[in-house]
Amino acid sequence: MPPVLRTVAELRARVSDWKAAGETVGVVPTMGALHEGHLSLARRARAACDRVIVTIFVNPRQFNNPADLEKYPRTEAQDAALLASVGVDAVFAPGPEEVYPRGFATNVSVSGVSEPLEGAHRPGHFDGVATVVAKLFGMTRADRAFFGEKDWQQLMVVRRLVADLNIPVTIEGCATVREADGLALSSRNRRLSAEGRARAPALVRAMQAATEAMRGGQAVPEALAEARAAVLAAGFETVDYLELRTADLLLPMERLEGRGRLLAAATLDGVRLIDNIPV
């Protein structure tokens, strides 16, 4: 089993030894409740770096709904066993007081890319993400950090953060891992009922159908409206957004030209699912 480190001091001591030996360090930031998507990130890090740290921290600052924070699954023993199978070198699993000690007063906010989509529906969420990620980069002194493309907006926020603050870490975006029926892997999926789980792939299927329609010449607003209707018809309670944007997310696309990203968030069984695909 990989050692589970609880304090920044323990982590820094270990990383200092690795750096002194000239070894490269990769980090995979997670909130635990690990699944094959997370493990694929750890394997990618394992292949690219001499040493791999997986962080497990349920970050209270990125939950704008306290009930969601309480419901978030915490499965550390199971997570550690999964990470042992991948061969990570250390798990960093601090408590909230270690990450945000008494007197902590700094908030990192990335303008622009953090504002639409998730930012509009979850105020403050990306401030919490940016703050904890900046701290984790400082704590781990990582050379490379691995993030899933499933959270595309988060990936764009982290890239902007690193570029703007000259943080010396390379951000690696890794392809979304999906179930056989197309559903993007997510820790939230375990909260779906059996019926909800069967309905859930309708989200990505509607997105794929819209993509094909737009590539075939259908007007973007019409294709998106049909996709939204299909998601609701499949049993989803709400669709927060279903938008075509430039890959950097800064601008909505009214017509299909250049690289775009189709992004969606919808609620099923009271569980909010997000997904995105390239267009």
UniProtKB/Swiss-Prot annotation:
Binding residues annotated for (R)-pantoate, in chain numbering: 62, 154
EC number: 6.3.2.1
Pathway the protein acts in: Cofactor biosynthesis; (R)-pantothenate biosynthesis; (R)-pantothenate from (R)-pantoate and beta-alanine: step 1/1
InterPro entries per record: Cyt_trans-like (IPR004821), Pantoate_ligase (IPR003721), Pantoate_ligase_C (IPR042176), Rossmann-like_a/b/a_fold (IPR014729)
Gene3D superfamilies on file: HUPs, Pantoate-beta-alanine ligase, C-terminal domain
Gene Ontology MF annotations: ATP binding; pantoate-beta-alanine ligase activity
Keyword Chaperone: no
Binding positions (ATP): 31-38, 148-151, 177, 185-188
UniProt binding sites for beta-alanine: 62
Active site residues per record: 38 (proton donor)
GO cellular component assignments: cytosol
UniProt keyword Cytoplasm, yes or no: yes
Catalytic activity: (R)-pantoate + beta-alanine + ATP = (R)-pantothenate + AMP + diphosphate + H(+)
GO biological process: pantothenate biosynthetic process
Keyword terms: ATP-binding, Cytoplasm, Ligase, Nucleotide-binding, Pantothenate biosynthesis
Assembly behavior: Homodimer.
Note: The reaction proceeds by a bi uni uni bi ping pong mechanism.
Reported function: Catalyzes the condensation of pantoate with beta-alanine in an ATP-dependent reaction via a pantoyl-adenylate intermediate.
Family membership noted in the UniProt record: Belongs to the pantothenate synthetase family.
Protein name according to UniProt: Pantothenate synthetase
Organism the protein comes from: Cereibacter sphaeroides (strain ATCC 17029 / ATH 2.4.9) (Rhodobacter sphaeroides)
Lineage, uppermost ranks: Bacteria, Pseudomonadati, Pseudomonadota, Alphaproteobacteria, Rhodobacterales
